[in-house]
Each structure stands twice: as structure tokens, then as C-alpha cells.
């Protein structure tokens, strides 16, 4: 029975949940694949989430930009202790970043990652989640796979909500 149940298991919201956000129901493929991992973050879980994003398949030929992208929107990892700035900077050396197209950063701690990212990957940095939400419409497009990851206290779950509000959600 346990083996059968695992096939229907879905992670709780904010813990790796995957969903499709339909931007325009009248246009085939006009969707964003959203990975909501906005409940918790530490260096190990950040690596695991980046690995999932790196393996994801964006779709080309749809949207304004035409080329589907792998986009990470990363919020602060909280309660890491005295070496927290170094831990944020160290994400810039994660091997999974090589497969991503752009990384946007949210929060004062993630400013350290933003500064350490290779220029080709460096998206925008926002002081807080509210500032990122204001810009979300121009940062994502149909065909993209978007990971939103951060500690609950970074409030990047509001970025997830802003992406959902771009269209009509389809589970």
C-alpha cells in the first residue's frame, strides 16, 4: 500500500511543489512551469533545488522572448550563523548554475550571492520580496521554468503568488 500511496504524494505548498501557470488559455503552450520552494532554505536544500531546476526542460517558441529559460529567484537563507554571508556567496560556485539562464536575488543576504555571480547569470537584486514582485511580469515569460527558493522569513512566497497572478493556474 505504501508503494501505491507514494505515487499520489504531493509535497506541501512551498516545499518543492510544481505547478503550471497558464498565462493565456487561448494560446497553446503559453505557460510558466513554477517550482515553489519558498518555505525553507539552507545551503544543502538550495543545492538540491538548483539541481532540480537544472534538470528541468524549458519550452522554446512561445512567449515574448521565444527561448524558454531556467530562472532561479532566490531569497535569503536565514539563521545560518556568523558565516551566513560566505554561505550565500558560495552558491555562486554551485555546479548546477551552469545550466541556468538567469538568477535573480532577493534580500540583503542574497546581495552577497548577486555580487559573486558570473555576469552572464546575474539578474536583478531586490531589497525585499515586495520589490521583486513589482518587477515579476518583465522577469518571466511563457516557456520558462521558474524556481522560487528562500527561507520563509524572506517572504519569497509572495513572489510565487505574484507569478500565479500573472495568469490562470493549472495544477
Placement of each model-derived feature along the sequence:
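ATP-dependent carboxylate-amine ligase
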Residues: 1-171
